[in-house]
Curated annotation (Swiss-Prot):
Described purpose of this protein according to its UniProt entry: Component of the ERMES/MDM complex, which serves as a molecular tether to connect the endoplasmic reticulum (ER) and mitochondria. Components of this complex are involved in the control of mitochondrial shape and protein biogenesis, and function in nonvesicular lipid trafficking between the ER and mitochondria. The MDM12-MMM1 subcomplex functions in the major beta-barrel assembly pathway that is responsible for biogenesis of all outer membrane beta-barrel proteins, and acts in a late step after the SAM complex.
Molecular functions per Gene Ontology: lipid binding
Domain SMP-LTD: 128-370
Protein name according to UniProt: Maintenance of mitochondrial morphology protein 1
Lineage of origin: Eukaryota, Fungi, Dikarya, Ascomycota, Pezizomycotina
Listed transmembrane segments: 22-42
Highest taxon, organism lineage: Eukaryota
Subunit structure: Homodimer. Component of the ER-mitochondria encounter structure (ERMES) or MDM complex, composed of MMM1, MDM10, MDM12 and MDM34. A MMM1 homodimer associates with one molecule of MDM12 on each side in a pairwise head-to-tail manner, and the SMP-LTD domains of MMM1 and MDM12 generate a continuous hydrophobic tunnel for phospholipid trafficking.
Region (Disordered): 271-306, 395-415, 448-471
Bilayer topology: Single-pass type I membrane protein
Cytoplasmic side: 43-471
Length: 471
């Protein structure tokens, strides 16, 4: 009999692997819990800028839910059923109120305070006065452009400043009969620019607007400039017969200095509110009527835009202005009288009266604000800097606009159309029609029967070298 075999069992590895797995699992759970606590509980929240960037860059997905579809259908149905006047949301009644505007723009202005004797006094705002340095730069650029335009058009027969002044001074309805034709001998439009400063906003009473009206006051000063106008004319003695005696007169008027307080405010259209006693009626303002009507805006039979209220910019000067004028005169032909004081007083009084009758309180000048709605007729393209060789005296308006820095869109369209026409011409010449557009040499080769020339003429543009010609 065989003895029982004492077989030794190998050591089990399952207990060791189970222990390792348990420890590894516990360790991973601890790491996950620690990472969660560190990054989600004690982590810093993202900044508002990063949240805004992520929201802007996130892809937009349309929602095709039933509720959104029903809402869109109901909204479109309500828009179709409602009147056109109810589509635009109503403007709050306090939108033009002075207090509301000042509160929303964070400007502290003290309104009018009434005294016991029923008189009111204007208080300046508690806001610090503005220096208006940026405004001076803009006004200087505008005046410089006007001066340059006036100099460029000095030789124009219709739109020069000399012809305009001569026509105005020789107006038959205003010029007396004892003054001969007035000839302008010298014009100087100056070299310096007005300086605006100390701007402040005040609230004034206006019966035509709700809550009063805001008015900007700014000091303006113009000195050491060369604004002058020189004329020559003859004084006629029409008794006992017309032009029985003639007295030559030469005058030169120069503005030495001007300073004052400019008042600027916005007033509503006189057509929508009652006419103010200090504002002229639109029927008396022939210059305020547009000379060129916009085809997109309806007009009535008189050519006036109908149904569109216009807001105007009103500006004037306070009565405490200063206008210093220098007048030089020369009277006579042989024994001339120079710089007569009485003539200087008369001319200065006339200029002062002309100025006060137009832009000194309580009289104001109204300028209708233009429409700022974007239109293709006013659209331009900013040109590049490579226009040094372009002549400014060119008669092409597109070239002038390009030289000034902007090119009208119409000019771009014309150039694009011209390039298209040129390309079409090139395509026609490539086809080589012998009866219409072939040159004289090509026609002679065709009449001689030169097939090689014909094949070269009828070769497709862009074909490979050595490719067979089109039959």
């Amino acid at each position: 009999m065989s003895s029982p075999q004492n077989t030794s069992c190998p050591p089990s590895q399952h207990s060791l692997s189970f222990t390792q797995g348990l420890l590894l699992g516990q360790l991973s759970v601890v790491l996950l819990i620690g990472a969660f606590i560190k990054f989600f509980i004690f982590g810093e929240s993202p900044s508002s800028s990063s949240r805004g960037i992520s929201q802007r860059t996130a892809p937009r997905k349309r929602s095709y839910s039933v509720n959104s579809t029903l809402f869109r259908d109901a909204a479109s149905r309500s828009l179709k059923e409602s009147a056109s006047s109810n589509v635009l949301r109503p403007v709050p009644s306090s939108s033009t109120n002075t207090k509301s505007i000042l509160r929303k723009t964070y400007y502290n202005a003290i309104p009018t305070n009434f005294q016991k004797n029923s008189r009111h006094r204007l208080h300046h705002s508690t806001h610090q006065p503005e220096s208006l340095d940026w405004f001076n730069v803009l006004i200087a650029q505008l005046i410089a452009q006007y001066r340059q335009t006036a100099y460029i058009l000095k030789d124009s027969p219709t739109s020069s400043i000399l012809d305009s002044l001569t026509e105005t001074l020789n107006n038959v309805d205003k010029k007396p009969s004892w003054i001969d034709r007035i000839n302008v001998t010298d014009i100087s439009i100056g070299e310096e620019f007005p300086i605006f400063s100390n701007c402040r906003v005040i609230a004034v009473e206006d019966p035509n607007s709700d809550g009063g009206r805001l008015q900007a006051l700014m000091d303006v000063d113009l000195s050491d400039d060369n604004l002058s106008l020189a004329i020559e004319t003859n004084l006629l003695l029409n008794y006992p017969k017309p032009a029985s005696a003639v007295l030559p007169v030469a005058l030169s008027v120069s503005v030495v200095r001007f300073s004052g307080t400019l008042c600027i405010s916005f007033v509503p259209s006189p057509g929508t509110t009652e006419s103010s006693p200090h504002l002229p009626h639109p029927e008396n303002q022939n210059e305020s009527k547009p000379s060129r009507q916009d085809p997109e805006i309806p007009t009535n039979k008189d050519g006036v835009r109908s149904g569109i209220p216009k807001t105007s910019l009103a500006f004037s000067f306070l009565p405490d202005y200063r206008l210093d004028i220098s007048v030089r005169s020369l009277i006579g032909s042989r024994s001339r009288l120079q710089d007569v004081p009485k003539v200087a007083q008369l001319v200065e009084a006339r200029v002062q009266s002309w100025f006060e009758d137009r832009v000194v309180e309580p009289r104001v000048q109204l300028v209708a604000l233009p429409g700022i709605w974007p239109r293709m007729g006013r659209t331009g393209v900013r040109a590049q800097e490579d226009h040094d060789a372009v002549s400014i005296d060119s008669e092409d308006p597109a070239t002038k606009a390009t030289h000034s820095g902007f090119t009208p869109v119409n000019a771009n369209r014309d150039g694009l159309q011209a390039s298209r026409d040129l390309n079409m011409e090139g395509l026609r010449y490539r086809r080589g029609n012998a009866g219409d557009e072939a040159t004289t040499d090509e026609y002679e080769r065709l009449t001689r029967g030169d097939t090689q020339s014909v094949g070269e003429q009828l070769r497709i543009p862009g074909s490979l070298p050595g490719a067979p010609a089109v039959a």
